[in-house]
Amino acid sequence: MKKIKFLINIVVILTLSIGNLTAEEVKIDETLTIHYKQVGEGDTTIIFIPGWMMSTDVFEHQLAHFEGSKKYRALTYDPRGQGKSSKPVEGHTYQQHARDLARLIDKLDLENIILAGWSYGVTEQLAYLNQFGTDKLKAMIMIDTGPDITGATRDEWVWYLNDDSDGYSRGFTEGIIENREKVIAEFSEWMLENPTPEKVTWVSNIARQTSSSVASINNATGFYLDYSRDLISQEGKLPLLYIVRQEMKEVADRWIKANTPSATAVYMGKHMMFWERPKAFNHALDNFLSSIEGK
């Protein structure tokens, strides 16, 4: 039966194998094939979700950390329009990304899942929670983004102001179309704690795999999303871990303690702390995983 299911779904097309790391593809539908990487073979699957314009490559240190694991499978994928996944014309909202994620989970027959979204990847995983609930979820990890994208002031844990009076959202929505290379370079540099030319180039090359129109639409539609109620509803029910950049500690900590007080929160580095500080990040991850074993 498993072989038949495999053939019917055309689930896995092996494209690369290095050690225990495999890079594969899943055909979601006629317009979308998702590229993903995975290591390990445990009963629990940790799914790392890249942020805006990013790809599986950013989680290289987490995949290396779980390589050969017998307890955890670590998986990361390129959302539609990003990295090596298909570039369809339609569907570039985080609500649709969540539906793509649900199809990916079904195709790979995954259960006992820990979602670990980063940046707009948090929005994607909360959109999944909103649409599909927690039946297949074991825990959630939010990496440097809260559940609401906009707020009235910078005292809130958000990316943008409701009226965009500082032009920050416009800079990404319109700017990525009008001045693509400038936005990519500046955004790549901002994400890094130690933005050497080599690092900025590496991150920028990943971003260039996403078209300007797709990036603009994702940012524009993400502006309106608020999944605070969905996340707060899991307080005391689903284990939650927040790993947030150091400069946001005061604002993020206030929201976390007020709304999900049983959650674990760790603060370090800048936006790409998991890549620049892999030992500290993976240590925090391991501590969280140990704390929820048996739950």
Task: Tell what function each PLM region has.
Residues 21-33:
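N-terminal cap/lid segment of alpha/beta-hydrolase-fold proteins
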Residues 8-19:
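Bacterial N-terminal signal peptides
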Residues 73-120, 269:
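Active-site loop/oxyanion-hole signature of alpha/beta-hydrolase fold enzymes
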Residues 262-295:
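Catalytic active-site module of serine/aspartate enzymes centered on a nucleophile-bearing elbow/loop
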Residues 126-130, 136-175:
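Flexible "cap/lid" loop of the alpha/beta hydrolase fold
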Residues 32, 38-87:
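Conserved HGGG/HGGXW glycine-rich cap/lid loop of the alpha/beta-hydrolase fold
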Residues 209-260, 265-268:
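Conserved serine/cysteine hydrolase catalytic core
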Residues 151-163, 173-233:
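Conserved alpha/beta-hydrolase catalytic His-Asp/Glu region
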